[in-house]
Amino acid sequence: MTEPTGIYIDPSSLRERLPRPYLPNNPAWETLYWRAWELGAKMVRAGTPTNSFAPQYVDAAFGGNIFQWDTCFIAAFARYSRELLPILPALDNFYGRQDADGYIAREYRWENGANLWAKGSGDSCNPPLFAWAEWLVYQIHGNAERLRQVWPQLDAYYHWLTKNRRLDNGLYWITDMGSGMDNTPRYGAAWCDYSIQQALNALTMSRIAAVLGDDAGVQTYRTEYETLKMQINTLMWDENDGMYWDLDAGDLAMKVKTVAPFWALLAEITTPAQNQKLLAHLHDPDEFWRTHPFPTLAANDRWYKTHGDYWLGAVWAPTNYMIVRGLHTIGADDFAREAVARHLDAMVAVLDSTGTIWENYRADEMAAGIPARPDFVGWSGLGPIAMVIETIIGIDLDAPNNTVTWRVPPQSVGVENLPWHGGRLDLFCSADNLRIWSPKPLTLKVIDGPHRLTLEILAGERTVERPS
């Protein structure tokens, strides 16, 4: 079987077709940004008659097999590419292989499209993030018909998980390999991340149902979400430790401190008081606030490895993105920006010394993790692309509601050619003003330090003064 090969896209074409950031105070981040797109473009694959994958789709950069949770995270930055990196066909590769009972495998073979793992194996599932990935892409293209088309697959998959991965206490189980954190030192019966991810799944499904006008679906999934939220907080939250823990078969806490509990911020299951306790762990230099944040295992855990050893302390793009999006969800925007700046600086240092972007990184020095694959975009494009647009420049697009939220940073930044209603959107800020170009009127929600503004922006170019 011929090995998969990517397509070639000329760098000048990339710059013409993709969003172009303006980061005058951090030109090295711009270099990293474009390097990520160049590597990502090489991961656009062509399916074969033997595997029946899509004619073109973006791949996980891991040897040809397609991986469920990699693909879902890749959606978070590929969505800005106007399908230059074809993310929707990549997701369709999984839906097209769904079993009649709703099951979708975590990995399918390049050679023949077959499931790599036995269906009954605990390793055969991955975090249930398809609905979340579809919702992220929907925020850019605003195409409700796409959500309508994939709803049956998403709904069937959710219910397969409830029948096959839900425990008697209402929580969910997985294995280390199935969790995506392959060698994480956890052996619980109920896993906090998998349970919280299923809550996020239910929350997102309720939002998709609302878009589709499915009132019964909204009610079903909202009830699922609230029930699971209650069980997670009742059984997994430890008030003294300020942490969610995995549970053993007797519902006793298994206290291995990983990044898994921080999914709770993104899934909106926490109270403000819980947020502060979780933030304290992220801020703690003995745990997660290292030279390069955030290691996937706390640095004061006995299993922590300074060289990373995969999920025993390495810094990984998907979990960093999850944490950063969670920080924005609870309004911790300044901390998110500081964390992303550290993440990007570390990636730049390693790019300068090695010429490429890596699968994972060490938390305590500017180096790739051991082991780690080079040229990994793949999901390592999350920092240079998605976090630059969403955290450093500060932009969240909501095309369905014709609304842009801009968390304006103190320094001058900008971006042009964001995908927006079939055209381009440009946003630039200086110390004194904001400049916007849009092909149609939009609502702009500005968060500028303590100031909150909602502006109705007309089509074309407009300049407004920053609040003081």
Identify the residue ranges that each predicted region occupies.
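Acidic/polar, glycine-enriched structural segments that form the non-catalytic walls/loops
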Residues: 1-64, 136-139, 144-151, 155-160, ...
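Alpha-helical scaffold segments in carbohydrate-active enzymes
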Residues: 35-42, 93, 153-164, 197, ...
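Aromatic-rich carbohydrate-recognition surfaces in CAZymes
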Residues: 64-170, 191-195, 199, 314-330, ...
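Short acidic alpha-helix initiation/capping motifs at coil-to-helix transition points
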Residues: 8-17, 66-68, 223, 256, ...
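Extended glycan-interaction surfaces of carbohydrate-active proteins
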Residues: 19, 23-66, 89-121, 163-190, ...
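Short, contiguous, pocket-lining structural segments
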Residues: 186-200, 217-220, 224, 256, ...
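Non-catalytic C-terminal accessory modules of carbohydrate-active enzymes
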Residues: 283-288, 325, 329-468
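Structural helix-adjacent loops and short alpha-helical linkers that scaffold large soluble proteins
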Residues: 19-30, 78-91, 137-155, 207-226, ...
